[in-house]
Amino acid sequence: MSVNSKLYEGKAKILYTTDDPEVLLADFKDDATAFNAQKRGSIQGKGKINCSISSQLFKQLEAYGIKTHFIDSPTPNQMLVKAVKILPLEVVIRNIAAGSLCQQTGLPVGTILKQPLVEFYYKNDHLGDPLLTRDRLYLLELATAEQVDAITHLALQINEFLNKFWQQCGITLVDFKLEFGLDSQQQLLLADEISPDTCRLWDTTEEDSNRRIMDKDRFRRDLGNVEDAYQEVLQRVLKAVETTN
């Protein structure tokens, strides 16, 4: 399969068209951003690590019955994906209070939620990716009520699977972001990536509130050892996959 032209460049990936209109090539970058790209940097090897982690998790989710855009990973930092029209929504699933949830509600960091919280954010950097109510979501016509219900159901299914998987890795899944898209048949697919860039991950065996962090919060908060943390997550994922298979 040949790669044609650049279709889109985002913060973490570049998308290219291929000779198949139904297939795109995603090239994962080492670039790192935080706070809606107000903070920028680079994490050495991040592209390869995130592509590898995402590929493994997409395969596991497909086997679990979740339809994703994943096709194959021809190189360590590249992924062949089904072409989808991304819904302009960031779907955040929270199991433990952290980040903006604590800032906006006053909940102490680390509070275990009685049930997973599913939130929708408007995928719009110019507006700062604001939290949406369902009524606002419908007002902006970002998705239909049927799509929102389907996404919520899928998000909870994905959370149930990933919670168990990360536990096998000795990692606590605090919260994470998902994106969904529609293929040419209007089928809803899980898209984007699942990685330390999009998940808040804590080392289950580490009690120190800083040392336990294994995700992009290390970059956001200048905690150091970002590359080592990402690499450790990858190694644990590969070990868990090997054990599962």
Swiss-Prot record:
CDD domains: SAICAR_synt_PurC. It is an enzyme of class 6 (ligase). GO terms for molecular function: ATP binding; phosphoribosylaminoimidazolesuccinocarboxamide synthase activity. PROSITE patterns: SAICAR_SYNTHETASE_1, SAICAR_SYNTHETASE_2. One of its GO terms (biological process) is 'de novo' IMP biosynthetic process. It catalyses: 5-amino-1-(5-phospho-D-ribosyl)imidazole-4-carboxylate + L-aspartate + ATP = (2S)-2-[5-amino-1-(5-phospho-beta-D-ribosyl)imidazole-4-carboxamido]succinate + ADP + phosphate + 2 H(+). Pfam families: SAICAR_synt. Gene3D superfamilies: ATP-grasp fold, B domain, Phosphorylase Kinase, domain 1. InterPro entries: SAICAR_synt/ADE2_N, SAICAR_synt_PurC, SAICAR_synth, SAICAR_synthetase, SAICAR_synthetase_CS. It comes from the Bacteria. The keyword Transcription regulation does not apply. Its EC number is 6.3.2.6. This is Phosphoribosylaminoimidazole-succinocarboxamide synthase. HAMAP family: SAICAR_synth. Belongs to the SAICAR synthetase family. The keyword ATP-binding applies. Pathway: Purine metabolism; IMP biosynthesis via de novo pathway; 5-amino-1-(5-phospho-D-ribosyl)imidazole-4-carboxamide from 5-amino-1-(5-phospho-D-ribosyl)imidazole-4-carboxylate: step 1/2. Keywords: ATP-binding, Ligase, Nucleotide-binding, Purine biosynthesis.
